[in-house]
UniProtKB/Swiss-Prot annotation:
This is Cyclin-B1-3. It comes from the Eukaryota. InterPro entries: Cyclin, Cyclin-like_dom, Cyclin-like_sf, Cyclin_A/B-like, Cyclin_C-dom, Cyclin_N, Cyclins_cyclin-box. GO terms for molecular function: cyclin-dependent protein serine/threonine kinase regulator activity. Expressed in roots, stems and flowers. The gene is CYCB1-3. One of its GO terms (biological process) is cell division. Belongs to the cyclin family. Cyclin AB subfamily. PANTHER family: CYCLINS.
C-alpha cells in the first residue's frame, strides 16, 4: 500500500482557536535558550527600546570607537564579550580621559634557552671549594695548569681535580700484583719479550697510547689470577690487545689480522675463547686508571715541550716491559717518568711546587722508582728487545731514545 505525506487539517475560518497552544507558539525567539545577544545589558539596566538594525549598528560603532581610543583590537560583530561592550559604552558615556595602558611586551623563552641560561649562570658561580683551591695554589706558588682550558667545555675544568682525586683513591684496586712466583712456566724475560712484541704490533696497527697501557694492565691482572702455560702466553697477549682495542679504539683490529700477526700460531676461535676467559676472570672490569691517565695530567703540570713529553713516554714504556715496575702504583710510575725525564734534560728546578701539588708526591718519595727507570734506561741500548727503542729513535718522536740517561740518578741506581 502506497504511503504519502500526511496532510493535517487546516482550521476553518470561524472555528475556535486553542489559545493555550497559541500562546506557547508565540514565545519570543531566542528568549529562553541561552543564546542572548551580546549587546543587551548596557548602562542603565535593560534597554527600554527594541534592538533594531540601526540601533545595533550604532552600539557596535560606539564600542569600536572606544576600543580604538584604547589601542585595543577592533571588536568584531558577534565575537566581543558582553562585559567588554559594556565597559566600552560606559567609558564613552562618562568621558574617561585616562591614559591608555601600554602594550605588554611578551618574551618567548624556549626550553633550550632556559638550559643555556642556567648553564651560564652555574658557570659563573664560584664554589667555596674552588676558592680554597685557588688560595692554596696562590700560597704555594703553584700554577693554574687548567687556565687555558677554562673556556673549553670539553675539558671539564671544574671537575678535573675531583676526577684525579678519585683516580688516586681507586688506583690500587686495579693494580696488578707481582705474580712471577705463581707462574711455573713463565718468567720475567718471557713477559718482557711479549710486551716488546705488543709494542711493535701496536705501532703496526697505529693504535692509541691508551690501548697499549690498558693491554699491559689486562695481561698482568689476568696472569696474577690464573696460571698460564708457556704456549698460551702470546695468546693471552693478543687477546688482551683485542679487548683493549675494542674498549679504546673506534676501529679495532680484526681478529683475522691478529691471527696473521701471530704467524698463524693461533686461530680466530682460540683468540675469541681466550678473550671470553680473560673477561670472565676480570669480571669485565676494564674502566681502570692506567699509567697513561696520570701521564697526561703530570706532563701538563710539568709545562713541558714536545721533547720532554716524548722522553716521558719513552721512559714509561720502557718501564712497562719490566716486571719490577709492578712494585709501584701507576700514579707513582707516571710521576717518576716525568721526574726522570726532567733530570735527563737538566731541567731546573727538577721538581716544582706545581708538580708536587698535582702529583701528590715529593721529590724524595719518587727517588726509588726514578732510579729504577734510570737503570732500565741505561740498559736499553744493550738489550736485544728493540721495539720501544726503535719506536722512539724516529725523528717523528724526537729521537729521544738517543738521549743519555740521567747521571744524577745513576750514581745510586739499583
Amino acid at each position: 500500500m502506497a504511503t504519502g505525506p500526511v496532510v493535517h487539517p487546516q482550521p476553518v475560518r470561524g472555528d475556535p482557536i486553542d489559545l493555550k497552544n497559541a500562546a506557547a507558539k508565540n514565545r519570543r525567539a531566542l528568549g529562553d535558550i541561552g543564546n542572548v545577544d551580546s549587546l543587551i545589558g548596557v548602562e542603565g539596566g535593560k534597554l527600554n527600546r527594541p534592538i533594531t538594525r540601526n540601533f545595533r549598528a550604532q552600539l557596535l560603532e560606539n564600542a569600536q570607537v572606544a576600543a580604538a581610543a584604547n589601542k585595543k583590537a577592533p571588536i568584531l560583530d558577534g565575537v566581543t564579550k558582553k562585559q567588554e561592550v559594556v565597559r566600552a559604552v560606559q567609558k564613552k558615556a562618562r568621558g574617561d580621559k585616562r591614559e591608555p595602558s601600554k602594550p605588554i611586551e611578551v618574551i618567548v623563552i624556549s626550553p633550550d634557552t632556559n638550559e643555556v641560561a642556567k648553564a651560564k649562570e652555574n658557570k659563573k658561580k664560584v664554589t667555596y671549594s674552588s676558592v680554597l683551591d685557588a688560595r692554596s695554589k696562590a700560597a704555594s706558588k703553584t700554577l693554574d695548569i687548567d687556565y687555558v682550558d677554562k673556556e673549553n667545555d670539553l675539558a671539564a675544568v671544574e671537575y678535573v681535580e675531583d676526577m684525579y682525586i678519585f683516580y688516586k683513591e681507586v688506583v690500587n684496586e686495579s693494580k696488578p700484583q707481582m705474580y712471577m712466583h705463581t707462574q711455573p712456566e713463565i718468567d720475567e724475560k718471557m713477559r718482557s719479550i711479549l710486551i716488546d712484541w705488543l709494542v711493535e704490533v701496536h705501532v703496526k696497527f697505529d693504535l692509541s697510547p691508551e690501548t697499549l697501557y690498558l693491554t699491559v694492565n689486562i695481561i698482568d691482572r689476568f696472569l696474577s689470577l690464573k696460571t698460564v702455560p708457556r704456549r698460551e702466553l702470546q695468546l693471552v697477549g693478543v687477546s688482551a690487545l683485542l679487548i683493549a682495542s675494542k674498549y679504546e679504539e673506534i676501529w679495532p683490529p680484526q681478529v683475522n689480522d691478529l691471527v696473521y700477526v701471530t704467524d698463524n700460531s693461533y686461530n680466530s676461535r682460540q683468540i675469541l675463547v681466550m678473550e671470553k676467559t680473560i673477561l670472565g676472570n676480570l669480571e669485565w672490569y676494564l674502566t681502570v686508571p692506567t699509567q697513561y691517565v696520570f701521564l697526561v695530567r703530570f706532563i701538563k703540570a710539568s709545562g713541558s715541550d714536545q721533547k720532554l713529553e716524548n722522553l716521558v713516554h719513552f721512559l714509561a714504556e720502557l718501564g712497562l716491559m719490566h716486571h719490577d715496575s709492578l712494585m709501584f702504583c701507576p700514579s707513582m710510575l707516571a710521576a717518576s717518568a716525568v721526574y726522570t725525564a726532567r733530570c735527563c734534560l737538566n731541567k731546573t728546578p727538577t721538581w716544582t711546587d706545581t708538580l708536587k701539588f698535582h702529583t701528590g708526591y715529593s721529590e724524595s718519595q719518587l727517588m726509588d722508582c726514578s732510579k729504577l727507570l734510570a737503570f732500565i734506561h741505561s740498559k736499553a741500548g744493550e738489550s736485544k728487545l728493540r721495539g720501544v727503542l726503535k719506536k722512539y729513535s724516529k725523528l717523528g718522536r724526537g729521537a729521544v731514545a738517543l738521549i743519555s740517561p740521567a747521571k744524577s740518578l745513576m750514581s745510586s741506581a739499583p
